């Protein structure tokens, strides 16, 4: 395992934390799109959904993903040599979750803790009012941050989990299962999804809504399979709010989703493209 003098970094509003060797930085607001299906009333300081970049239209996306998906690249017009060629086959959707896939491959998942963790550099922005909280309801939590001053019965939160993956497998094959655990949530509706690499690593991100305890929740969930030397890690981030708070909380959730980073201490990863702003 590659060792580094760098420690896990958390971005926050100009504060300094010394517990567990956490370094805190000031971070600006980026953008994601955990947005509700219907546009709510305008809120001061938050741009309306009309400011989103044009949504790309695709004709066939596997796995039950919406056909209006701004994560999918614009299809290129076929050149003269491509005309008349048969269309490419669409891969059949997978039914196993990532954890089911790893179990079938006899891959051992070893939960990691932030204290002394040096295999990867992980950046998790902490917006204003959000704080790191202990949460026994999150199995194997690496970090949990939440807005405990919000107005909703549901506390907006972000959960980070990191596992060392012990065993042999193909990360590109594994990440094809990245949507399944989220799609199995009650009354799940997808709004955006992508399996593009993230910081140079195989990754999946899916966003949408689901039902839990009588509430509709809006969530963004990303899996990253990161390498550090010969070792591989599953880094999973979920950012969730009540649907009724999705627009009001957008500056905070956007900052978390777009400011999140994963890199190997010895490899300079490319900066991924920003998601559309609200």
Swiss-Prot record:
Residues 1-28 form the signal peptide. Keywords: Signal. It holds the Pfam family Lpp-LpqN. To M.tuberculosis Rv0040c. This is Proline-rich 28 kDa antigen homolog. It comes from Mycobacterium leprae (strain TN).
